[in-house]
């Protein structure tokens, strides 16, 4: 399905994933199988981030009331619209999940210059991608997404003043 969006070319990893990040992807694949999905989507990545309990993403999500219990019912009720098919790569990842993984790699390499990509980059990229099932699930679960974004940055030791306009485009907004 071509939705008119420009697709990024899947980058080869130039920095390695942390053990926690690799575990998130494994748990996402496991969640997709448990759900009977023929693909691994952003909703499964979100479940993987929650199930992996040691990473920044898991801690921030749990601190903001995003739990596996809340998400499982919402995910199991998700159905593709009639006539639409999830397009996926050979590994079963949807294009939107690939976009998030690309975005995480870009953030880690180009903006934060880290040596390993951790779970926090999956969470930041999910929020910044904006149009994905995982983000809609967080919002439906009652999460304050900007708060999650800024708490993730704070957990990384980032100066929050430099990121006030990331989500709003307005440097005066973005924080309480």
What is each stretch, according to the model?
Residues 1-176:
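Histone-fold recognition with a strong bias for associated Lys/Arg-rich disordered tails
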């Amino acid at each position: 399905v071509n939705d008119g969006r420009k697709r990024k070319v899947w980058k080869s990893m130039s920095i390695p994933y942390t053990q926690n990040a690799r575990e998130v992807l494994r748990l996402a694949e496991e969640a997709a199988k448990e759900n009977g999905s023929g693909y691994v989507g952003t909703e499964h990545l979100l479940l993987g981030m929650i199930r992996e309990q040691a990473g920044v993403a898991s801690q921030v999500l749990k601190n903001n009331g995003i739990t596996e219990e809340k998400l499982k019912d919402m995910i199991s009720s998700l159905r593709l619209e009639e006539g639409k098919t999830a397009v996926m790569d050979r590994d079963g990842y949807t294009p939107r999940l690939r976009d998030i993984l690309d975005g995480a790699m870009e953030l880690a390499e180009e903006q934060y210059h880290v040596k390993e990509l951790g779970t926090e980059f999956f969470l930041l990229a999910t929020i910044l991608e904006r149009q994905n099932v995982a983000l809609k699930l967080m919002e439906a679960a009652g999460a304050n997404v900007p708060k999650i974004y800024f708490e993730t940055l704070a957990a990384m030791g980032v100066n929050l003043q430099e990121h006030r306009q990331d989500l709003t485009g307005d440097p005066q907004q973005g924080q309480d």
